Amino acid sequence: MEQDLARIEQFLDALWLERNLAENTLSAYRRDLSMVVAWLHHRGKTLATAQADDLQTLLAERVEGGYKATSSARLLSAMRRFFQHLYREKYREDDPSAQLASPKLPQRLPKDLSEAQVERLLQAPLIDQPLELRDKAMLEVLYATGLRVSELVGLTMSDISLRQGVVRVIGKGNKERLVPLGEEAVYWLETYLEHGRPWLLNGVSIDVLFPSQRAQQMTRQTFWHRIKHYAVLAGIDSEKLSPHVLRHAFATHLLNHGADLRVVQMLLGHSDLSTTQIYTHVATERLRQLHQQHHPRA
């Protein structure tokens, strides 16, 4: 079993070198694949002897055990990449994962906010306090750019150009993109940089654009707590919330106002257009709701 676990680490090292995956993604692969190895060894199998039927049985047991389809899909993705790696490295003469059936995933629409709800959320921070001025600038940038929360908290001073009104983002797979900020976000960034950030740093030298109260890089979890705090103040239902709620609103509202789908794809940093297309369903659903509410024959 130790040898199989060592092969997982070799695979993760290769992934990190080739694809520059985030640590969270690598940790998820490690957990899933370690579980696969333990499951196989419990049945007298190894990575070298496992067959497609074994892996399909494992997936079936997960479904019967009440695991969500998304969890099974993630596990299947990990197994496919791993066994493809073992095949390329000539540790195996075949790839048993190639025969596995994919679980059917329910299409879930992203949680979105109306433009009025977003406006209330953006107005929630008290801008006369440095900490909340930082949060105000972060919310404005998030809605103006559609960044992922991890991208937002990772921004540095050198990533923004207020003169040009753009932000440079290093997204998934280490892909770089330039995203316009818009006048409102630029204004609040300028205000924050003059009246908020110096107070937060308190003499500490750090390149992070949005430091925490301890003059360190803020975590995604911390910012998520801040969003929930302001949502309560704005009277927004918690069911409407997710860490990426403003990213979803950014995409949906752009499409509602006639933006081209491929432009939205580029701004969001999606490598696959199908990932962006789900926002068209959100926009369509919003139109359907409005029709039902206001049309006399709906």
Swiss-Prot record:
FtsK may regulate the catalytic switch between XerC and XerD in the heterotetrameric complex during the two steps of the recombination process. GO terms for molecular function: DNA binding; tyrosine-based site-specific recombinase activity. SUPFAM superfamilies: DNA breaking-rejoining enzymes, lambda integrase-like, N-terminal domain. Keywords: Cell cycle, Cell division, Chromosome partition, Cytoplasm, DNA integration, DNA recombination, DNA-binding. It is found in: Cytoplasm. Pfam families: Phage_int_SAM_1, Phage_integrase. Changing G182 to A/W: Abolishes plasmid resolution but not chromosomal recombination. Changing R177A: Abolishes plasmid resolution but not chromosomal recombination. Changing A185V: Abolishes plasmid resolution but not chromosomal recombination. The active site is at R148, K172, H244, R247, H270, Y279 (o-(3'-phospho-dna)-tyrosine intermediate). Residues 2-87 form the Core-binding (CB) domain. Changing G171W: Abolishes recombinase activity. Changing K172A: Abolishes recombinase activity. GO terms for biological process: cell division; chromosome segregation; DNA recombination; DNA transposition; resolution of DNA recombination intermediates. Forms a cyclic heterotetrameric complex composed of two molecules of XerC and two molecules of XerD, in which XerC interacts with XerD via its C-terminal region, XerD interacts with XerC via its C-terminal region and so on. Site-specific tyrosine recombinase, which acts by catalyzing the cutting and rejoining of the recombining DNA molecules. Binds cooperatively to specific DNA consensus sequences that are separated from XerC binding sites by a short central region, forming the heterotetrameric XerC-XerD complex that recombines DNA substrates. The complex is essential to convert dimers of the bacterial chromosome into monomers to permit their segregation at cell division. It also contributes to the segregational stability of plasmids. In the complex XerD specifically exchanges the bottom DNA strands. Belongs to the 'phage' integrase family. XerD subfamily. This is Tyrosine recombinase XerD. It comes from Salmonella typhimurium (strain LT2 / SGSC1412 / ATCC 700720).
